[in-house]
Amino acid sequence: MKELSSAQIRQMWLDFWKSKGHCVEPSANLVPVNDPTLLWINSGVATLKKYFDGSVIPENPRITNAQKSIRTNDIENVGKTARHHTMFEMLGNFSIGDYFRDEAIEWGFELLTSPEWFDFPKDKLYMTYYPDDKDSYNRWIACGVEPSHLVPIEDNFWEIGAGPSGPDTEIFFDRGEDFDPENIGLRLLAEDIENDRYIEIWNIVLSQFNADPAVPRSEYKELPNKNIDTGAGLERLAAVMQGAKTNFETDLFMPIIREVEKLSGKTYDPDGDNMSFKVIADHIRALSFAIGDGALPGNEGRGYVLRRLLRRAVMHGRRLGINETFLYKLVPTVGQIMESYYPEVLEKRDFIEKIVKREEETFARTIDAGSGHLDSLLAQLKAEGKDTLEGKDIFKLYDTYGFPVELIEELAEDAGYKIDHEGFKSAMKEQQDRARAAVVKGGSMGMQNETLAGIVEESRFEYDTYSLESSLSVIIADNERTEAVSEGQALLVFAQTPFYAEMGGQVADTGRIKNDKGDTVAEVVDVQKAPNGQPLHTVNVLASLSVGTNYTLEINKERRLAVEKNHTATHLLHAALHNVIGEHATQAGSLNEEEFLRFDFTHFEAVSNEELRHIEQEVNEQIWNALTITTTETDVETAKEMGAMALFGEKYGKVVRVVQIGNYSVELCGGTHLNNSSEIGLFKIVKEEGIGSGTRRIIAVTGRQAFEAYRNQEDALKEIAATVKAPQLKDAAAKVQALSDSLRDLQKENAELKEKAAAAAAGDVFKDVQEAKGVRFIASQVDVADAGALRTFADNWKQKDYSDVLVLVAAIGEKVNVLVASKTKDVHAGNMIKELAPIVAGRGGGKPDMAMAGGSDASKIAELLAAVAETV
């Protein structure tokens, strides 16, 4: 067997299948395009569904790929096992109605065993097959596989409800008795026992039947066009070919682990407690690729998955003694490992690093206190002999310290404790009720309290300086005022400060505090307004600080200027929106960060591409006009007379600041700005979207980021032009339109065929009328694509007097969907479905005339249908 790098394995895979007439399908973006059924691309075949379902006909029916994929259903197992990953790479070869079993098996065996290719020892390979699939068994024998290496497995049949299905044959590599301490042998395969001896490296799915849950498999009809769908995990192949004990000891992960060793000062022990190394290595791969593909950490959907992965990795970093931000430092290593096939990680390195670092910093503001609090809670449970972490304590970790509930649960379980989910939900509801009665101030300080409310010392923000000397007025540590502090995190108030407190959509400044010797004694990580308006500096204390002492306060000037570019551009954007789409387009929220600006505004429809172009052009014209920016302090009425617009979310006192950009823009604003519009450099809108009824959002970049955005657009256009074989960039649109027109025609034809098929199916279903207890009923299993189709059946049924009651069941994917409709007062559909649903391990409910339920046990569908007569 050849010892190859992961890059060599991937390339050899693609080269082999190219030699067999396959075209190479590039790896798709991890974020699915036009497929709302998927959160992530999760397999090699996921991007080829358009070919397998016939909506698009490939130019070449033979396809091979190496597809980056993400699966997050087993996050908790990552690091605990040898082979669980969130982000992985699936190698595949596919035949769309072309070659079938013979070639798939023969070529697969050739790739694995030929000295020209992988050169696996034949005696180390074992194959499983579906017992009734004698053709696959015979084909393996014809390839030279010993009968003793072929294991029949009843589960080797791929099907998801009705539709294409077929047997599959899996290929395993035997790593020997060293990985089988109890010497169980082939029973590990035959009985599907979890083990580290026989490693599944490849699965070949022979899609040859049209599954029909109403009949035995032996009666499934053959598909007119048979397909091949295979998947081989690159990480597993690399582990086998590199002689690694686990996937993590391969060249795909070890360079990352080595970097973690450097950062932590700890050594990775393949035979010891190495879970944290594995978690970090796995999660930073997923984060790097997902963020590079456009997904960002957030509070829902994909964003929540990324935030959860990042926070889990950070916590495992803490376990290794890494207490500073570190994950972003691993991004270049990920990029270097994958550069040969996925150059985009290094190309987008700066962006990915910044997103990861910012998210780390956000989490780090409270993680120390949160971890300490959790440790105290668990110690208290142990002392009291309890085994469950209470809901109110979970909520405090979640609400005050920012810990994800899943992370709390995982940490508690690691320590041998359970968590009170219901208690957490109750505490969450109480908090939501409180929020309705009073606004709770957010920010890194957590929540308002008496200590903060008691700050009455005066403090003044100085706009026009990046550094100044000031007296320290207030120190708060552990929620108590104190005269001095020498470590940990603290909140500080100075007599005056150059640090801008987060307000009006502009993020807070960061920077340093120095003593009279020029030594840095604290790092400012956040600034929020205290209840009485003073800038409240959240700092990491590095050396002694004491009230009444003078310190030098220095902001991060480069960061401030980047934020000012975006904030000033926001004013220009606001004015341009008024001019292009109307005065109604008023600000509904904004965020001016270092890397981008986000502007929310009221508007009743999506902004057209032409309007966006005009807006972008107008903003840039004002930048190039080099308009002088002036600020004036005056009263509100005078400001209004000057034509100033008030900003969303701001409360104005007697004296307000008016920011004027030439004669183009006049706004009330308490933020910081540039001196001249030309300093912005360039403005580029990167996204426009709806975020709620009547509210739109524009995300834009300025300066260097704007230039990068334009360059990326140009690169993308060049790639599109090359893909559609446009002779020049200007011809790309016409080429794409032609392809789109062709696709639309095919889709229309497909929809018409589906309509006809559904109508025919409905006629057959409604013919089978039964009667029980004087009630006429129809009970049938139907083949539909989604639950909505069941409702369509019911709507058609209502139009005529077919029966009094209709019961339909459909196996859709791994779920069972049940519908009950009733036209008679004697049968309550909602009550009836409550009796039927448990039969298929489900539950549901509804109205007297219509009810639906979902279940998970498709094997009990026939039993459910038989029970209808008893429940009417």
Curated annotation (Swiss-Prot):
- Family annotation (InterPro entries): aa-tRNA-synth_II/BPL/LPL, Ala-tRNA-lgiase_IIc, Ala-tRNA-ligase_IIc_anticod-bd, Ala-tRNA-synth_IIc_core, Ala-tRNA-synth_IIc_N, Ala-tRNA_ligase, Ala_tRNA_ligase_euk/bac, DHHA1_dom
Q: What protein does this entry describe? A: Alanine--tRNA ligase
GO BP field? alanyl-tRNA aminoacylation
A Gene Ontology term for the protein's cellular component? cytosol
Q: Give the GO molecular function terms.
A: alanine-tRNA ligase activity; aminoacyl-tRNA deacylase activity; ATP binding; catalytic activity, acting on a protein; transferase activity; tRNA binding; zinc ion binding
Required co-factors? Zn(2+)
Where is Zn(2+) annotated to bind?
Answer: H567, H571, C669, H673
Subcellular compartments: Cytoplasm
> Any idea what job this protein has?
Catalyzes the attachment of alanine to tRNA(Ala) in a two-step reaction: alanine is first activated by ATP to form Ala-AMP and then transferred to the acceptor end of tRNA(Ala). Also edits incorrectly charged Ser-tRNA(Ala) and Gly-tRNA(Ala) via its editing domain.
Concerning NCBIfam families, the annotation shows: alaS
The Enzyme Commission number assigned here is: 6.1.1.7
Sorted alphabetically, which Pfam families does this protein's record hold? DHHA1, tRNA-synt_2c, tRNA_SAD
Keyword Ligase annotated: yes
Annotated keywords: Aminoacyl-tRNA synthetase, ATP-binding, Cytoplasm, Ligase, Metal-binding, Nucleotide-binding, Protein biosynthesis, RNA-binding, tRNA-binding, Zinc
RNA-binding listed as a keyword: yes
The record's comment on protein family reads:
Belongs to the class-II aminoacyl-tRNA synthetase family.
Cite the PROSITE patterns for this sequence. Answer: AA_TRNA_LIGASE_II_ALA
What this protein catalyses is: tRNA(Ala) + L-alanine + ATP = L-alanyl-tRNA(Ala) + AMP + diphosphate
Cofactor annotation comment: Binds 1 zinc ion per subunit.
Q: What is known of its domains?
A: Consists of three domains; the N-terminal catalytic domain, the editing domain and the C-terminal C-Ala domain. The editing domain removes incorrectly charged amino acids, while the C-Ala domain, along with tRNA(Ala), serves as a bridge to cooperatively bring together the editing and aminoacylation centers thus stimulating deacylation of misacylated tRNAs.
Designated gene of the protein: alaS
Principal location listed in the UniProt entry:
cytoplasm
